[in-house]
Amino acid sequence: GGFDFSFLPQPPQEKGHDGGRYYRAKQGVGLGPGPMGLMGPRGPPGASGAPGPQGFPAGEPGEPGQTGPAGARGPAGPPGKADGHPGKPGRPGERGVVGPQGARGFPGTPGLPGFKGIRGHNGLDGLKGQPGAPGVKGEPGAPGENGTPGQTGARGLPGERGRVGAPGPAGARGSDGSVGPVGPAGPIGSAGPPGFPGAPGPKGELGPVGNTGPSGPAGPRGEQGLPGVSGPVGPPGNPGANGLTGAKGAAGLPGVAGAPGLPGPRGIPGPVGASGATGARGLVGEPGPAGSKGESGNKGEPGSAGPQGPPGSSGEEGKRGPNGESGSTGPTGPPGLRGGPGSRGLPGADGRAGVIGPAGARGASGPAGVRGPSGDTGRPGEPGLMGARGLPGSPGNVGPAGKEGPAGLPGIDGRPGPIGPAGARGEAGNIGFPGPKGPAGDPGKGEKGHAGLAGNRGQGGKGEQGPAGPPGFQGLPGPAGTTGEAGKPGERGIPGEFGLPGPAGPRGERGPPGESGAVGPSGAIGSRGPSGPPGPDGNKGEPGVVGAPGTAGPAGSGGLPGERGAAGMPGGKGEKGELGLRGEVGTTGRDGARGAPGAVGAPGPAGATGDRGEAGAAGPAGPAGPRGSPGERGEVGPAGPNGFAGPAGAAGQPGAKGERGTKGPKGENGIVGPTGPVGSAGPAGPNGPAGPAGSRGDGGPPGATGFPGAAGRTGPPGPSGITGPPGPPGAAGKEGLRGPRGDQGPVGRTGETGAGGPPGFTGEKGPSGEPGTAGPPGTAGPQGLLGAPGILGLPGSRGERGLPGVAGAVGEPGPLGIGPPGARGPPGAVGSPGVNGAPGNPGSDGPPGRDGLPGHKGERGYAGNAGPVGAAGAPGPHGTVGPAGKHGNRGEPGPVGSVGPVGALGPRGPSGPQGIRGDKGEPGDKGPRGLPGLKGHNGLQGLPGLAGQHGDQGPGPVGPAGPRGPAGPSGPAGKDGRTGHPGAVGPAGIRGSGGGYDFGYEGDFYRA
């Protein structure tokens, strides 16, 4: 029952309700037909309102109520939030039970005027109704006044052709009025918009039955005009007398539809009609579109950097990285200015004896230096393997141990004085910066003396390692020992008998710094002096490119061995550095002309490491010396401190103290790479930290030279053990066979160089080990194969570091003694790095000495500035690999480095798993009302509706039927008459079931 307001905005359908495109008005009891309102203009579509409350069950269909005026447009609902999920379409609700017919409701608020529909098809002609019973002819009524013609409505869009509705309820029979004159056929007006059906007008009084007039000829069927606007309803005429019922004429063709009449006055409510059939279940409406996605918020300003986090925990010791590829040798830098030697520190543990190289060509003897006053006799050092003679340096006298003084200006190298008597072995001082090479003196003319026996190793004390002070002034050259006669220049002397190194002579007073002399030819490397105290470890730097091997220089005449140079100031112990990459072992080079100091020998047994002090400024790193061939490889330990260099070559200018860099990530220890050719010896670099002391084994007898053994794999470094007192060095073992070159491992990742701290005080030197037995002096033979490493001695206890003393002057070098290599002493502490000297020609490599006990790995020091890369020396013999040292304490993490550039964009990673669907968001606020949509296309014409069935006669306020008259004869079919004026609208009869007509808009049908 009721009208179909499907064009109104539809409320959302709840589950279980009859949804669909048809918005059916609730049925209720009407109060009678009302006047029909004019079609209003099309309003913009309204926003969806909130769902209305559940309506009452359907009432019994009542008579259509009068159409009220078009209601005002309701306010737009609040904007919905745009982030709601689109609802899923609800399932069609179950068909509700047809409720009892409710009482006719009051007329509802008139809905919004519908959109103008497309003109519908002409409906099929309704079935001819059964002829009604002839009514009693009433009195002819007074002719009614012609109503004012209604205004012609604007032509509406053609509606779809509606289905032929069922015949409407029969209106109550009105009184027959007098037949008015047939008016002229008016022009077919434009079809107005379909208005709502007007309510029936008030029932007219029954007039007397009039006589039936003759049937007029049926007029031609007029075209169906569009519904025009109804004219006003005229007042009812006076009822005439009931006329006799005339014979029913033949049904004429439908005439042109007149314009709909204006709504009549509201009638009295009729009785409640019977319950109408339940309408068909509506289609479920489609879900509304999802709300538009909210716009992304503006990107916030980048947040300020947070505070620096605490330093991260120390990582595990990385495995040793493999050796890097050999880089090309960089150009030799110019000799730097000679730095003033630092005050002498307490002696560090002896370094490993270097490999004795064949005597180089003897250089011209330099002029004798002024003899300095004799210093205190130092303790005899461990005999080291004889290296190629270097140019004599200018050690100063050993002064009393003082605190580090400021660095003095470089002095001029003094001439070497005569070799003084061997004094007691003094405490090893800090390693000073290498001084510039002096001019080569004329060869001495004395005979070579026998090498003295090695003195006992001194006891080491235990001192706190203080910060290394700046280098002291270079002392005056000490008294030189008696100079032997220099050999003729260039002539190779017959190697003398190998004597044990005698005790070092006293240091002379330090003379004023001299000007750097011109670089003389490289002399033979002198005996390896005891290592100075360990200097600070530098931060692990990036591995430099390995220089290409240089060609061996021509053999120079062997110079006389110089006295041990003054020890430089000890650098403070730095933080524990990363394990460096093992360099390639070089092959033995030929005797070169006298050049800069030869390769540093293998470290001796480790002395006790002093407490970590502040690191001194690191000097530039010198070029790598020749590597020995690897023996059987034990666990690779950190490198022990280097022994004292031979007489220094011309010193390079000390580099500026670098700022401490941020500590980089610890690199993995790489596998030991294959031995590369040895480059030409550069100036001695800073000593590395002492390796951990291994257990001292008994010295085995010298073994026969074996074949080279295969290199063993590097084991992981063990934890640091407690440093024991240094034991006496074991006897030298036999040389082992030369092992094959190991594969070069990948380069480990280095940390960033930290800024050098101030040098710390050096600890006292640990006790010396027992000297190894010296072999009988013999003539130098060809270099033999490497012997197997001897058993390592027990580590010595860590001595306290004393204050550095002033270095004495270097005496003239004595004759080069020839003898078997002595036992390797413990490595001394690492001193401050010296200034790089200009690289000299490579000296001849001697046979490798035995491996000493590894010392404890020292704390990591600050890295110094890198020195110029020296020319590659001739390959030296393969040295034996020392036992692995224990890892030292890990250094404090450096400050965070600056952020590097953004790396290249990596490949896109795989898509992550689909996240869990988030909770449904709160519905957003309803957006502002949109602009009215464009008018849709005209809908397709609907199919012609089926003819409706006859409605049942309802119990309307119909008057009593008159007696049925006799049926008159059917007259001939008359012609179509002209359209008459619209008569008064009769009262609505009972509504027929079904039928109606549809008019479409935008493809949808609306049922009226």
Curated annotation (Swiss-Prot):
Q: Post-translation: what modifications?
A: Prolines at the third position of the tripeptide repeating unit (G-X-Y) are hydroxylated in some or all of the chains.
Q: Where is the composition biased (Low complexity)?
A: 38-81, 164-193, 239-260, 301-314, 358-374, 409-428, 513-530, 542-552, 582-629, 636-656, 674-684, 704-714, 768-795, 803-813, 826-842, 862-884, 892-907
For this UniProt record, give its keywords in alphabetical order, as a comma-separated list. Extinct organism protein, Extracellular matrix, Glycoprotein, Hydroxylation, Secreted
Which spans does this entry mark as compositional bias, Gly residues? 336-345, 455-466, 553-562, 694-703, 751-760, 989-998
Subcellular localization: Secreted; Secreted, Extracellular space; Secreted, Extracellular space, Extracellular matrix
Q: Name one GO cellular component term.
A: extracellular region
Query: What are the start and end residues of every segment in region (Disordered)?
Result: 1-999
Q: How does it assemble?
A: Trimers of one alpha 2(I) and two alpha 1(I) chains. Interacts (via C-terminus) with TMEM131 (via PapD-L domain); the interaction is direct and is involved in assembly and TRAPPIII ER-to-Golgi transport complex-dependent secretion of collagen.
Per the entry, what this protein does is:
Type I collagen is a member of group I collagen (fibrillar forming collagen).
What more does the record tell us?
Answer: These protein fragments were extracted from ancient femur bone collected at Rampart Cave in Arizona, USA and around 28580 years old.
Name by which UniProt lists this protein: Collagen alpha-2(I) chain
What does UniProt list as this organism's lineage?
A: Eukaryota, Metazoa, Chordata, Craniata, Vertebrata
